[in-house]
Every structure is written in structure tokens, then in C-alpha cells.
Amino acid sequence: MQCYTELLPPSGVTHAISLPFLSATSNNLIVAKTSILQVFSLVNVAYGTSAPPNADDKGRVERQQYTKLILVAEYDLSGTITGLGRVKILDSRSGGEALLVSTRNAKLSLVEWDHERHGISTISIHYYEREDVHSSPWTPDLRLCPSLLAVDPSSRCAILNFGIHSVAILPFHQTGDDLVMDEFDEDLDEKPEGASNIPAQAAVANDTTMYKTPYASSFVLPLTALDPALVHPIHLAFLYEYREPTFGILYSHLTTSSALLHDRKDIVSYAVFTLDIQQRASTTLITVSRLPSDLWKVVPLPPPIGGALLIGSNELIHVDQAGKTNAVGINEFARQASAFSMVDQSDLGLRLEGCVVEQLGTDSGDILLVLADGKMAILRLKVDGRSVSGISAQLVSEKAGGSILKARPSCSASLGRGKVFFGSEETDSLLIGWSRPSQSMRKPKVESADDVFGDHSETEDDEDDIYEDDLYSTPVNQTTLSKTTSQTNGLNKDDFVFRSHDRLWNLGPMSDVTLGRPPGSHDKNRKQSSSRTSADLELVVTQGKGNAGGLAVLQRELDPYVIDSMKMDNVDGVWSIQVGAPDSTNTRTSSRNYDKYLVFSKSTEPGKEQSVVYSVGGSGIEEMKAPEFNPNEDSTVDIGTLAGGTRVVQVLKSEVRSYDTNLELAQIYPIWDEDTSDELSVVSASFAEPYVLIVRDDQSLLLLQADKSGDLDEVNIDGILSSHRWLSGCLYLDKYHTFVPTKGQDQPLSDNILLVLLRADHTLFIFSLPTLTEPLCSVDGVDLLPLILSCEPPPKRVTYRETLSEVLIADLGDSISRQPYMILRTANDDLILYQPYHPKTSLDKPELRFVKIIDHFLPRFDPSPKAYMPHSKFLRAYSDICGYKTVFMSGSNPCFVMKSSTSSPHVLRLRGEAVSSLSSFHIPACEKGFAYVDASNMVRMCRLPSNTRFDNSWVTRKVHVGDQIDCVEYFAHSEIYALGSSHKVDFKLPEDDEIHPEWRSEVISFMPQLERGCIKLLSPRTWSVVDSYELGDAERVMCMKTINMEISEITHEMKDMLVVGTATVRGEDITPRGSIYVFEIIEVAPDPDRPETNRKLKIFAKDDVKGAVTAVSGIGGQGFLIMAQGQKCMVRGLKEDGSLLPVAFMDMQCYVKVLKELQGTGLCIMGDALKGIWFAGYSEEPYRLTLFGKDNEYLQVIAADFLPDGKRLYILVADDDCTIHVLEYDPEDPTSSKGDRLLHRSSFHTGHFTSTMTLLPEHSSSPSADDPEEDDMDVDYVPKSYQVLVTSQEGSIGVVTPLTEDSYRRLSALQSQLVTSMEHPCGLNPKAYRAVESDGFGGRGIVDGNLLLRWLDMGVQRKAEIAGRVGADIESIRVDLETISGGLDFL
């Protein structure tokens, strides 16, 4: 009874495509990350300096233009995406094109953008995994066969090649076609609505439309029906410039094989077929035979080039429409592997396996090749008329940006205007721009960042500051980004220059993971601090391949970088004040306008608060006397500035006080009811130049406006505003005209002030100031929290409603993109985010709607008295916290609401205790930082940590090493990380081999490459390498572990040692050998300039063994280790002379991939890559390894670990099919044969290739169990709970959590309800996605935590209905969801 929850989505990009998706004129990028589908728009921004020396004759300044990616929508699909295609359909809802998504097991989903829902809408889904298609006994399983999606450039049909020989053809209706929907053969055709229609697109109002769906009936054919010679297809793609759908295909009549090259040389053929969809026939146009056997891809080329480019491992071949070929060999093996006629360019020495091809523009024959190591090459096709007369290749130099990509790209998408996107699973995905040096003297008309995003007050002109705050732009490389000529950089005028515009971070592939301790708190007064601001542990994973290798440091909560801190008693609030000069109107736009005052509110007695004012200067903060500042010791509600920063307004409980820039009293405005003369109190306040909104305790409103002199005057409120009661309200400056359309270029910003109010009956009103007579919009039933908030009336019969406490509309984003969001806070501190949008239904008066943002934030319940905060206003917006526009929620669940240009809004917790107040803080020592007060009365001045990303609910930092990191281990005693890295080196056959004397005469310059390992020490204080140990030729690190070992047989001294297992592999026909290293990390005198270099590696023991050392672990309590060497598992101990003495062993079968011990028990598991998992035990008297049980399924083990659950012992196993299996050792079960057989309880398909499994430290399943102040006699025993952390090659992180019987029943029933009651993106079934076909064990399956968390996305009424069907209440389900999504409090 377990639950799998994905904590971090995959980040490696697998597929990408560009198309006009949101509208007919838009340019969108669609990105697939295994199971995540993201929609991006593009925006051009310009950076530069306004210094006069860079100005031209007219005083204009040329600024560097960048294209940035802006995330529009993101969807988690219940399937693994295998292909994307663009289809132009008739009468799309957006006016743009539709997207065709292929997923694993032969499924096609056709989706389009729906402006009514502000999201994707599934037109249809088509299934082709029918049994009759795969009835042949020798046909491989469908899940083992890759699928290929190809779409006709004219959108007449799409082909899905699946199951090796099967193709599904899906026609699409186009203007003028003669397809008939009503005529189809039921024995051969699919139904006209497809296998499913979710929902079918409604019939359009145009009477001339003759089709109900944009597609016709699809059908499945074997490839041999098109041509009997298509026995072994390799690759196919549709071609351009044909009247009918025409595709080119690579195939062979025999299976290609490098080992049989002498007999199967040049057996590949290329053919072009034209499809007649109506007759289901094909016509062969051309056939080119005797092609090289290493061809693997067809790349269609648009006009004017036309034809197709065939890519092989050693050559490139162009085939035009008439079958004429031109070829070039790019390494010396091209001549040896093929007799095909080609131009010799073997001096390039390129390896084309896994390369990506993209055409540079449509008016030339230049093609960009990105190789597997990230290097770039330009392929030039010499065009003579409409035919290609020659082909040549040239590498791109580093000066021209040829080394921008560090590893192999997985896909590419041309975005037009000199922009190409390269997605990668091995490094960051890049948006790259290209140009020629001859164009550098041109000055293109670009938009500045100010023109794109509106008012200049939130942007900076200083170039250094811009790049410091722009967390998502690539740092400027003066070599490749400066405007150069051939005289300055040595480039020819026809060469291409590449530069990076934007990037999508990738945390994969995660090959290893460890838990380490942060280097320590940055708090200067750490001894005075009574609360933690740094994590106990941090998660460190390896990421990247090749030159892109490095580490990623992950934390679940935000650890602020503390500049300074101090202890103050009875502090309730903190506010920073930034004032402006009275004679200047542009002062506030300067980035150097620091805060002048810092105000603290201190409780003196009930109902009384003292305002303590500090003066902020370059030397720090000093307390100052301000006798006129709140002399009556009234409670402060909020503090802000008006009149261009010349008036400081302090809103107190009983009055509003206005001060000048020196905090001298200028005005007092009382808070009282003019009609009854009753004294009222202020509940909350909101500022927006020149207004201040006040909500009083009788739920009435007071709106004040500052005149030109700064004096406050009351704005007359009539009608709705005066006759109703209001729960909450705020003011919002609509800079970007999201709510109110633009009225003119000269419209002042004061005309864009919105008054947002939440009525007592939870009706939302939005007014556009100064108009207060009629609301801009009103939304009923906000407390129902539906997916879409609109002006339509809610359902009449509603039983359940949410208790809302606060509403706020604020901008969220970074320096690239900022968008307004409405944030609702409930009485339980739940945060619900809505994004405003216009559905484009009426152009005269656009309707305003709000769509709910998906974020599964669950606040923690803190029963302690410190968690109680007296202030009623918990949400506060900030315009610039280290470059972010963000919202902070104070209270017992302190958190930021963050958003970047490439991510959706999400909640990020602030580590530590409850926070009573937080304010922005901008001084020279803490630029664009923040100051906050926690429940322990500790005041901290902080900044967000540098070089850190906040794109998701985890705080992420990447450390670039430059080599591929295969293993990582934390050495706790020395507080340092040990890395097992590798880099490629040329391999040459040994000349002294006596068995193969012919190797001595081998003459070759294009060497094969092998991995050579290196062991490095990395300091977490500076994240730099402090020591390294180079391994031998062809020797690489296979495993690494920190083990507490006995280093002396006499004294029995125990010490932590670093144990490394290696393998020396020189070829498949040479037996591999291995070595076991035992290192001691010693302390040495550091380099004076680098104090972190005080650690060195010292070899304590080394032993060469037969067979590779593939896994190692500690075992028992005597300081021994167990290692897998070849086909044996052996227990060894250290001797006095530094040798390793074997004491016990066990014979294995093939290749031991996993070897782990349940710490301190002697129980261990041994995972064979081909023969399943073994469960054994180690005894010390006598030394012996005993096999207890093993599985009978022969699982292909990739990763495994223990999962204790009370008195039960489970073993989790991840196989090569992205599936997690749950095994149990239960000798009392009759079906286990007295324990000899591990019981297979359940299976769960994750969709990701699991790389590691890690048993996390135990934690209490109940918060009260960890409270040391509780009396042990009064608290029931709460068992410790374990979790297993799962990482993947795609960069995702998940956790497997054991469940109690009651929780499992509730969540299992809830999962069944959600599968049938929710609409799923692309129409994919979550239950079918997670199920395993061979899962016939009858056990209880693993529940899907991500599907269960979608229950939180529902409206309140819908959640209650689903909970009622399950037989539970809302609170019990929330507790269960907190269990499956939490537990990692130490990170």
C-alpha cells in the first residue's frame, strides 16, 4: 500500500515544434518534456547602455536585441510523448493551427487552443493498439517499438509508424478536397469520430461547412502493403512541393549490421511514395538503391532546395525530386563502410550519430548540423538552378559561437527571423540566434524592454544591473555578441555567427544522488538566532553529460542569504520607506534610490504599539528620534508613500497620519463614521498612487486621494460601495492594460488604477478609478473557487463554500515578463491564484474572466502560540525583490508567490518560524532585498540566494564542473563532496598485444573514444574542485560510497573511508577488469589564496580484481564492505598492510547493478541487470552470505532499495520499462515458499527511466511526535515512517510513501473517482497510463499521487461531492494529501 508522487517534473526537452497556435498571427513554441507539454510565446527585448559614446549621429543608442521565451500554459499528460506535429485544420477555435500529439502505445491526440477556456481543447484522440494489428506471434511488443509521427506539410494527412511495420494514416479535411465522411468500410475503417471524441468539435455556424470534424476516418496498413520491399523500415518523412501527400522512406531488405558489414554493405534504399488516401493506394515515384548501410534519418528540405537530406553516421546525401544524388563523406570511415560515390571531406572527422539538422533560412542552401557533442557545422548545398550540384561541410569556430551547446540536442524547431530552438535531454535547451558578420553594421529597429513591458519605472538602464537582475538571460559574451567585422574577429562575411538568446534549465540526467549538509548559515549572529534559516540537509544530484556535466543542489524551502540580523523584543511589524525629492519627478525611477527609513512596530501593552524609526544610510541602520511619528502609540496597520514619494502615509488603527520626507507631521485624517460619529478602527489598507484604500472594522470603505500638494482628501463613495459590507479590498495599477483596454498613448497611469473589492457574500467587484458608479466587472460565487471565474451566475443550489479572508491583485514575474494575478487567501491559509484573460467573444466590450492556476500548495497547521499573528492583512505585494515581482504571505505559513518568464506561478516556502511581517529592503549593503520579523522576534535583513533559480517549488542551484559526473558522495566528516567524473579520450589498440600482432600495423587518425575516469573533491563553500585523482587509461568510476570501516585489526579503530569501484573496459572482446580503491580524505595546509583547499585524497588501499567492480556498500557492524566484482558479490575487510581480505562471497549471474544494505541489519539486496533481485543476509559468526529469497519474474533491475513499513519489509525495484515493482519478503505467506520467493505485490508505470532509488532518513508521521515539550506519557506511540526518493534520467524527482490501511482505502477510492470525473489533457487516461499490462498479481496497486493532488484543483462544491462518494470528508482527504506530498522537512 504505497503512493507514488512526482515532486519535480521532468526538465529534459524531448520534442519541440513551432506553429501559430494561440492565433493565426502568433509564433509559438511547443515543447514536450517526456510527459509535460508546454506552450511558449516569444517576445523581443533590448538591452544596452545609454552612455553617450555609444550613440549615433542623431543621439540614438543601439541596444542588443534578445528573443525571450514566455510560458503561456503547461500540462501534465498521462502519457509519454513520442512526437509532435502541426496541422492546419478548418475552422479552428483560435484561428491558428492545431497540434497533433503522439504518445506511447500508438495514440494520437489532436488539440487546439481555446480562447474561451484560455487553454488547450482536445478535438479527438485515436487509439491504434488493437490486438488485430499485432496478432503476429513474432511481432515484438508494442511498448518495445519506437513510434514515429510524420505530418504532411500541407496538412492533408499524418502518418504514425508504430510496431515496426504498421502505419496509421489520419487524413485531414482541407478546402477543396473531395473526402466523403459518410462512406467508410466498417471492417477496415475507423469510425468517423475517431476512436474517441473528447469532445468532438461542434459544428460551426457557417452553412458552407460540410464536415463535422476536421479529420476523416483513419486506417491502419502494413508497410508491405505499400511496397513488399519495405520489410525493414528505418525512417520516413513527408516531402515538400507535391500535390498529393508524398513521403520519403529509408529501408532495407535485410537488417543492417556493422558486424556484418562485409556481407551487408550498401543494402539501404530510399524511395518516394505518393499516397492516394481515397483509394488507399500508393505510387512509387523514385527509388535510389545501393545506399550506405549506416543511413538513419530522412530530413525533408523546403523549396527552393527541395528533395531530402539523408543522414548517415559517416556521410550526408542529398536526393532531389528526380532521384539525383550528391554526397559528402565527413570522416575516414565513409570510404571503408560504403562504395557509394561521394566527395571526400574526411579531414573534418565528424560523428553524425544523434545529430540534429535545421535549415538556416529558406532562401539559401545553408543547413546547420549540431553534433552529439554539441559542436556545430554548416552544410552548404550548391544550387544550380533548381538542382543541387554540390555539397560541402564546414565546422563553426568558437569565435562564431560554435561551442554554445555543450551536449547532444534531442530536437530542434525553427522559429523564423534567424532564431532556432534546440531542445536537449543532456544539457540546457537553448534558443539560438544566427546572423552574418556582413549584417553587423545594420541597425535593426528593435523594441526596448521599456516598450515591451510599459512604464520605465520598473526597468534599469545600467547594463551591469540589468544582467545582474536578469536571471534568465545568458551572460553577454563579447566575442560572439559584439558587433564585429571581418577585420576584428577574423570571420568571413559569409560565415554565420551564433549567440544564445534564452535557455530552459535541465536538471537531468540524474545519474546519482546524495544528501549533504549546507556549508553553514550565512547569519552573522547565528548564535543569537533561535530559529533555523538553513536546511539540515540538501539534495545534491548529478546533471548533464559530457562538457555540460555538473551538480544540481536542491532544497524544498527558500533559505535566505542573511546580510545582518538583530534581536528585538515584541516586534509585530516592519516597513521600509523610500522617499523622493520634492523637486524631482524622476527620482523614483533610479535604481540607486535606496530606502531612507526602516520602521518597526513594537507592542508595549494591549492595544498600544511603539513605532521605532531607524535611519538607513551607507554605514548601516541607526535608530533616530521622530517625535511626531505616532506619538500616541497607536497600532500601525500599514505604511506607504504618495505624491511621488514626498509624503509618508502611516495608517493607524484610529487615524491616518501624513508626514513629509523628514517624518514631520503634515496631516491627520481621522477614522470615523460621518453619519453616526462613531469611532471606527482600520482593518487593512492598500496604496496605489495617488489613492489609499482603507477597510474599517464595520466592513465599510474609506478611499483617500492625494492632491498635487500631497494632502489627503476623501473620495466620495456612493451606491454599491457605501451600501454593502466588504471583507477585503486592494488597489492595483494596471500598467499593461490587462483589465482595461488602452484608451490612448497619452493616457496617464492614474487612469489605470483598479479598485478590487470582495463583498461579504463573496462577490468580487472591480472598479476602474476614478469611476465608482459602475463596476468594470462583478463575479458572483468566488467562494466556490471554480476553474473559471466569469460574470455568469453560479449554480443556485450550493451546499459547500470556502471561507475567504483576503483578495489581492498584483503583478508576478521577473525582468522579462510580468503578468497580473488575483490571489485569494482562505481562512486556512490556502492560496488560490487566478489569471485574468479576455475570451475574445465580443470586440465591443471584452468580457473579463479568470482561470485558476494549478499549484498544489498545502499549508501546514501549526498549533503553537507563536504561529498566531495579530495582523489581519497577510498578503503583501513587492515590486522588486532581487529582480522578481512577488507576493509574500506572512503568518504560520510564510511563503513567496514566485513566477519567472519560463514557469507558472507557484508557492515557495520561506524556511524558519512563523513570520509576523516582511518588507522590501533596498540599501547599498542589501540591494533589492527584504527584511522580516519572525515569531522569535528576530529581525533579519536578507536577499535571495545568488546563482539560484526559483522556477518551481524547489530552490535550485547548478554547479558546472565541465566533466560528466557519474557518481557523487558526501563525506560528512570533512564536509566535502567526492565526485566520480569521466571525460572522453582517444583510444588506440595496444601494440604489445601478443594475440593480435596485426594491431601494430593499424594506421588510423579518426580514433574511437572511451571514457577515462577521475575522482575529484568539491568544496561546498566555494563549489570548486580542491583535489583530484586521475585513473588509468580506459578506467572509469562505476560506484562510490562512504563507508565506516575498521582500519586496524589491532585497535579496531573505525573511520569513514571513501570506497570507489572502477572498471577498465578496452572493448567488447576483451575481458574487463576492475579495481577497488579505499581513500582517506586528510587535512592539509591550504593554499593561502584558497582556504577551501585544506582537503586531499590519500590512497589507503587498492586491490585489482577480475571483473568490473560495479557496486559497493557497507555491511554489518564490524566495518566491512560488500562489493560486486564480475559475477560475484564478496565481503571484504581492511588489513593492517592496506590489503582487502575476502571473508564471504556469493555467486551471481550476469551484471550486478544494485547492491544495498538496510543499514545496521546485515540484510542486503543484489540487483542483477538481467536476472532480477536477490535478497540475502550477512552473518559475522561465522562470516557468511545467505540467500533468503529472490523474485521469479527476472526483472531487469535498474535501481532498487528497501522500504520498511512497520513490521513489513518491502523492496522497490525499477526496471528498464519505466516501471516500479513492489516486492515483499514474507516467509509466513504460503505463496512465498517459506520466503524463497519474493512476493510481487504491485507495479506502477512512472513514464520515466529511473536512475536511482534512495531510502530517506526516517521521520515522524505525526507533527506532535517531534515536539520535545510534550509529555511522553500523554502522547501515543507514533511509528517512524520511511520514504524512498526516486530520480530519473529525464530530470524528475518522485517519492514513494507507504500508506496506512485507512488512508489507502480513501485515496484508492478517490483515484477511481477522479479518473472518470475530471477532464484530462489530450484525452489520455491516467489509469491506463499507470497500469502495467503484465500486472496480474491481484495485489493492491500503487496510487498516483499527482492524480490525487488534482482534487485540490476542483471547486469547493465539486470537492465535497467527490469526497462524499469516497465516504470521507474534505479534511481527512487533505491530511492524506499532506502525507503523500510532504515528509522531506529536512531539505
Curated annotation (Swiss-Prot):
Residues 458-471 have a biased composition (Acidic residues). One of its GO terms (molecular function) is RNA binding. SUPFAM superfamilies: Putative isomerase YbhE. Residues 474-491 have a biased composition (Polar residues). GO terms for biological process: mRNA processing. Keywords: mRNA processing, Nucleus, RNA-binding. RNA-binding component of the cleavage and polyadenylation factor (CPF) complex, which plays a key role in polyadenylation-dependent pre-mRNA 3'-end formation and cooperates with cleavage factors including the CFIA complex and NAB4/CFIB. Involved in poly(A) site recognition. May be involved in coupling transcription termination and mRNA 3'-end formation. Belongs to the CFT1 family. This is Protein CFT1. It comes from Coccidioides immitis (strain RS) (Valley fever fungus). The gene is CFT1.
